[in-house]
Amino acid sequence: VASKTLAGPHWDEDYARDLARRNYDRSFHPKGIGFQIGAIAMSGDRTERLATLRIPSLVVHGTVDPLLPLHNGVSTAEAIPEAELLIFEEMGHDLPEKHWTQLIEGIKSLSNKK
């Protein structure tokens, strides 16, 4: 259920099951998600640190992300000097295969900048 909720309208059950199986086989640490959420909550606002970045940056965000609304991606891109923002319509908090080609093009474009 969580996978489907986070994914948005392009959820692929077979892909989600395969990914969950591979993640479980690779590293099963039930307390890990709690530690990760705690670390995120305790880390505070990163805006000032993002402003110090001097590297090509591509911020990728979906319009229907239930975990981090779109304004978070916009704010992140605005905080990083010269960052590019790639917004995927109807994408949740994952990256479905239908967007891979456009993401690859965005990364290639970014890598060609000096």
Question: What are the residue ranges of the model-derived segments?
Answer:
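Residues at alpha-helix caps and immediate loop-helix transition turns in enzyme cores, especially N-
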Residues: 69-72, 99-100
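Alpha/beta-hydrolase
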Residues: 1-48, 55, 75
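Short beta-strand/loop motif that positions the catalytic acidic residue
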Residues: 53, 59-61
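Conserved catalytic core of Hanks-type protein kinase domains
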Residues: 5, 79, 97
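Catalytic active-site module of serine/aspartate enzymes centered on a nucleophile-bearing elbow/loop
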Residues: 83-114
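Active-site-adjacent alpha-helix of alpha/beta-hydrolase-fold enzymes
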Residues: 71-83
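Active-site acidic short loop of glycosyltransferases
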Residues: 54-55, 82
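Acidic catalytic loop of the alpha/beta-hydrolase fold
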Residues: 64-68
